Amino acid sequence: MPTNFTVVPVEAHADGGGDETAERTEAPGTPEGPEPERPSPGDGNPRENSPFLNNVEVEQESFFEGKNMALFEEEMDSNPMVSSLLNKLANYTNLSQGVVEHEEDEESRRREAKAPRMGTFIGVYLPCLQNILGVILFLRLTWIVGVAGVLESFLIVAMCCTCTMLTAISMSAIATNGVVPAGGSYYMISRSLGPEFGGAVGLCFYLGTTFAGAMYILGTIEIFLTYISPGAAIFQAEAAGGEAAAMLHNMRVYGTCTLVLMALVVFVGVKYVNKLALVFLACVVLSILAIYAGVIKSAFDPPDIPVCLLGNRTLSRRSFDACVKAYGIHNNSATSALWGLFCNGSQPSAACDEYFIQNNVTEIQGIPGAASGVFLENLWSTYAHAGAFVEKKGVPSVPVAEESRASALPYVLTDIAASFTLLVGIYFPSVTGIMAGSNRSGDLKDAQKSIPTGTILAIVTTSFIYLSCIVLFGACIEGVVLRDKFGEALQGNLVIGMLAWPSPWVIVIGSFFSTCGAGLQSLTGAPRLLQAIARDGIVPFLQVFGHGKANGEPTWALLLTVLICETGILIASLDSVAPILSMFFLMCYLFVNLACAVQTLLRTPNWRPRFKFYHWTLSFLGMSLCLALMFICSWYYALSAMLIAGCIYKYIEYRGAEKEWGDGIRGLSLNAARYALLRVEHGPPHTKNWRPQVLVMLNLDAEQAVKHPRLLSFTSQLKAGKGLTIVGSVLEGTYLDKHMEAQRAEENIRSLMSTEKTKGFCQLVVSSSLRDGMSHLIQSAGLGGLKHNTVLMAWPASWKQEDNPFSWKNFVDTVRDTTAAHQALLVAKNVDSFPQNQERFGGGHIDVWWIVHDGGMLMLLPFLLRQHKVWRKCRMRIFTVAQVDDNSIQMKKDLQMFLYHLRISAEVEVVEMVENDISAFTYERTLMMEQRSQMLKQMQLSKNEQEREAQLIHDRNTASHTAAAARTQAPPTPDKVQMTWTREKLIAEKYRSRDTSLSGFKDLFSMKPDQSNVRRMHTAVKLNGVVLNKSQDAQLVLLNMPGPPKNRQGDENYMEFLEVLTEGLNRVLLVRGGGREVITIYS
């Protein structure tokens, strides 16, 4: 249940002594006596656990820094100087967030530190190329072109490549939204989607990678048994009940042996797999080059590859050589080997198959070449049912009534019933592998640059290869050869190999090693993915798979991966495993697009991808395309995959560990009702989800109208319609007397909110004092998770005026309240000069003066403002101050690197502030400030004296009148003394009580300024001079707001310091962080 507690003062004193009373009542057991002065919770700047820096180190080092920043010295323990922060943050090396990494020994850690970082080409482009180009290209693409025709094949490839391109765009946006952890794709997805969706998608990704291993192993065995060594088959067609059944049994036996062998290689050492990766990649590249070389050669010198036809039916040439029925030798005829296959004997009089007798045997060129014109014949699809003849269009054929022995004759038959949807499912795995680059994010020099560039270039390259191969295969190869899946009409040779130049063995050997390498890569990556999911602890029953060998190798995860991979191998058919693989990868890609779309639509402040070429409509299109492809491939597989993902989601939701990763899905909870409120109330949001939920404190005039309406304009510009906005105000008095005024004030505020397009809630409090009302608002505004974390208010411009001498007291106490509540504070000075929503700045700068680090609000606010049309054309500049001991050149480089990782575009300038003597102006200004402070106190004492004196005279006059009335009724008693007040006595009594105060006023002109105040004033004057020099013409200046002094006797001096700090600037926003990080470099 949502709970709200409001702290109210025990006893309110007009002179501000209620704070001390409240402190005394909090500790009734404290022994009496003088207490040492302790800062109250609002005086400092309490820090929460920071995702940026180690607070212990900061506290140890802060003693030595900031010697020239006296205005901020009381907060150095919590707010470090910028130079110290940049030194820790800018030169990080791949931090892993959210996962307990295995403790590696010092030697391996030293080796990793020395390992060279990879660039875009080696680190992303080539691995993606190797993973995308694979077994389907070599073993199935020609068959897909033959069955679906060039047009439909082109459509299939275009759909799949478009799907992966859109997914790559979404993935690039996610990958460049902060530092990509070394965990790769799983961490990127899970940290964007949250533990429930992240775990479900992570397991789908794991199962897809595991089944990919099974598919590659089956491809390896198919190449080996069909094209390299057919004689190595253990099961023969006669014993196994048919050639297809024998092939399946052989695949299972050889596949299992290969899986065990590969698993042993992975178990012994992954380094061998990584070393062989370039060799396997070279095989792929050489094979593709051989294909293009063969196409070029076929245009002017086609290879002599005859294909034998009986009628219009294609014959398998595994059992005969000559494509003739009989030979003519010396005027005598002799039957051929083909005759013996179709007849009961080799004699010319033997009984033969009816179709064999009725039709002629012809021979055509299997690869007529690019100039042959065969392209038009291959344009259209030729789908057929299982067991159908592979027939050539346009060749005459005499049909026969009944053919019972067709399967036993040497025809080329279709092994499965083909359809458009089946071909999509079989082909899609050939475009997966786009996340190979992000999986290596820990080894990249600049992951934010390399991942989008390398991945998209790899997809463009492979899409070009696939689409061009479809056109070239259709233009060079005869249709019946394309539809011959296993090359039976080519004497058992690989179709694509016969096209290649200089030799078919280039393709056969190249494809064999490339599929071997891809299988090894899958068996290497899948266990690590499972280990990462297990170590996250979101799926309790998988935690055992998070353990491994002493060097961190995932032994148990490898064992489970091998078992799951074995189930794919037992299926034994590449065409059956591929659609299963497609489902898991499509599910994964769907959620990547969903994550990007959700983050874009939510406009979370942390969503600042460095990759700019994305849009939520592209992500939505990619998500829709993934969903469509899932159901196109197989509707029952699609439903099964979604059911599996849904079950995992619900399991993690109800049984999994509580995780908070700053994901985009959880941001949707702020737009929901009770259920979402209860979910977001569990704790503060993750740094990545932090956005300013603003409580705007408005001042009202005597007619309950808003004094500073442009404060609401600024609020709407800052919020841009997103997040929570509470507009609050306080009326002095009692609610019974002021409820009509309160309603009128609330109507005025709502009307102004509507005019300024500020979407939010209005909350008005009637309180006996302005101070208490503001405190109540800060404590209790909002509900559950919909609570503010930032307070926005206007600077009290009249704090020096005599008609409002104590407005500064409410202001300083409000600063302390926000600090104690861990809330950020924004103070707009000269708020009436801030722009309205209708105005547009055509240029100019938003200048940020980053003096101390208090959570990153200074960087976040300009980014949010620049989303609005008013500030969009303004450029952002960040200034920071270097002191004598700082290396300003290195500071600038570090700050540029830091902003690069924050994905914020800004000009950077480091301003050097040398230590110099305190000027006479600073002394004079400090002296004037302290004299005014003392004078205010003396005036307050004089006012109290006057009030007490007037009350005394009133009492005495009342007493004298009562005595006179009594004398008319009774005689005077002798023991009473009658006092007579003359004018002289009254004046003497009056001025005698003021002697002390007059002497106090005389002392003001002989006092010397306090040295700590002089140093603070020195800082304020120097900073103001530097800011004026650089930012006098800026459209907006953002400054760190120093905290109020721990000694509350100097509150009015604090106001003077802020006044001096911002003097001469047009629009100023003073920013004070809420004690927690609000911006992060992580994705």
Curated annotation (Swiss-Prot):
Its main location: membrane. Chloride 1 binds at residues 433-434, 589. It catalyses: K(+)(in) + chloride(in) = K(+)(out) + chloride(out). The modification Phosphothreonine is found at residues 30, 973, 980. Disulfide bonds join 308-323, 343-352. Pfam families: AA_permease, SLC12. Activated by N-ethylmaleimide (NEM). Inhibited by furosemide, DIDS and bumetanide. The inhibition is much stronger in the presence of 50 mM K(+) in the uptake medium. Inhibited by DIOA. Inhibited by WNK3. One of its GO terms (biological process) is cellular response to glucose stimulus. It is found in: Cell membrane. One of its GO terms (cellular component) is synapse. Mediates electroneutral potassium-chloride cotransport when activated by cell swelling. May mediate K(+) uptake into Deiters' cells in the cochlea and contribute to K(+) recycling in the inner ear. Important for the survival of cochlear outer and inner hair cells and the maintenance of the organ of Corti. May be required for basolateral Cl(-) extrusion in the kidney and contribute to renal acidification. Homodimer; adopts a domain-swap conformation at the scissor helices connecting the transmembrane domain and C-terminal domain. Heterodimer with K-Cl cotransporter SLC12A5. This is Solute carrier family 12 member 7. It comes from Homo sapiens (Human).
